[in-house]
Amino acid sequence: RIGIDIGSSTTKIVAFEGEHMLPPMAVKADSQVASLYGAFGRYLYENNLQLLDVEGVYITGVGSKYVEKAVYDRPTYKVDEFVATGTGGYYLTDKKEVIVISMGTGSFFVKVTENEMKHLGGVGLGGGTICGLSSIILNTGDIHEIVPLSRKGDVAKIDLRIGDLAKEKLPGLNLDVTASNFGKADAQSKPEDIAAGIVHMVIENICQAGILASRNTGIKDYILIGGLTKFFECRQIIEDFKSLWDVTIPEYSDYATAIGAVIAPDAEKEEI
């Protein structure tokens, strides 16, 4: 059984032999359909699989809407992205109830318990925001250039923090908490500091939005998945939240949605 998450920029693929998951793979392509078929063929080749070995293909993600026929004539099913994300995130944790925060081109939040799955909403912040703002300000939209550049920067030179406004911490707010993203930035700010500010702003506000969206659920455990979670710099920012909330980035976090497409309940799978 093969799960494929066709994203806006990257296609991710996993396979299960029984309960055993084979190593996942990610493929980039300009065309989402080309990315799907390229990922599928390459995955079969690298894992010594034959087409007839494929019991079913389970596709999800924004690009799945472009797939209108069975993949290489194998049984093919579409799975709602929210369902796939919630299912995959839940599979990667040992918690009984969690909030799954998906951090991709944009971001959304799913509440998952043993008996319920609910989409809580989302925000228009993610990798697309980082690339778009950086294209305008830093003249590069390549996230593999932006994120390492941010490592060299100092976000304290860009963001205004509580400590810049108050001598003592406020109730529930430490002095290093952000008061205003880019509140210190000016025309002389260095590119590496700006990059740090952009990355920090996006990651921080996705996490904050996810926490606010889940406020009435009573759930305090958060699972972060999606493409942004694989970057070391993003993981460093997320570490700051661990003192306040139980935030986990599981192994294979960027493949959770592809995993969920395979293991989602049969009732959530629509055959093409």
Positions of predicted regions on the chain:
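Conserved phosphate-binding/catalytic loops in two-lobed NTP-binding clefts
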Residues: 75-82, 238-260
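Adenine-nucleotide phosphate-binding core of ATP-dependent small-molecule kinases
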Residues: 171-221
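Short beta-strand-loop/turn "lid" adjacent to the catalytic site in phosphate-handling enzymes
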Residues: 25-29, 40, 45-81, 117-119
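Glycine-rich phosphate-binding loops at beta-strand->alpha-helix junctions
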Residues: 59-65, 212-241, 253-254
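Glycine-rich phosphate-binding/hydrolytic loop that grips phosphoryl groups
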Residues: 87-92, 130-135, 247-272
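Conserved phosphate-binding catalytic cores of ATP/NTP-utilizing and phosphoryl-transfer enzymes
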Residues: 67-101, 106-116, 259-265
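Glycine-rich phosphate-binding loop plus the immediately following alpha-helix
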Residues: 90, 114-171
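Short glycine-rich, Thr/Ser-proximal phosphate-binding strand/loop in the N-terminal lobe
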Residues: 1-38, 42, 117
